[in-house]
């Protein structure tokens, strides 16, 4: 609940993560805020941002301003590997066919440790993990479908090569191992599955393998939402706060549509 009170427009070539601190400082300068709860999507999570938020909190306290800076930040999928142990530990005791929310800790290494420090600063942060079985099932099924289609294609080309080696003749140009490798590799790459299906481009014969350990790990990630937070709210409430961000994004889409109706795209003669 609440009403939007302000917005700012940043240069289009400015990375999203670099807008976080300036925006918070601007709000604190404009309004007598006592508590700030930052809820942001995956583009804003960085250890540097978390460290800077802690420094800003300390600076405000030194100035005598009693301002609480809290955050709920989503972990980008590309960084899920940093949380593999926490994911396995939390998911291991949970059902896969029911929604659940759990919490654990994440040890982050500060990138702003002074050069004189003998070891980088390690900070314990609260990590909330949520599982949506419906989303997990959709993603797993979609991936499995793509994998099976590629495997069928690979088996088809492998069968043609074996038949050619046995003396069978077919219409058109004969299929070569190098040609099959190149075509299959591009098919796998186009399906965004090169991290799962490995095509041996250096081998003389056409061959490929599936990384089953990686496949099981991706199935573990399916349907998961990872949130880093310093709030004291219950884990389920943290998840709900983050999901309310969708309402804000929906409002942005509506505003953008209204703006596009107006003649704002002018060109000079």
Residue ranges with predicted function:
Residues 1-269:
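Anion-binding and metal-coordination hotspots
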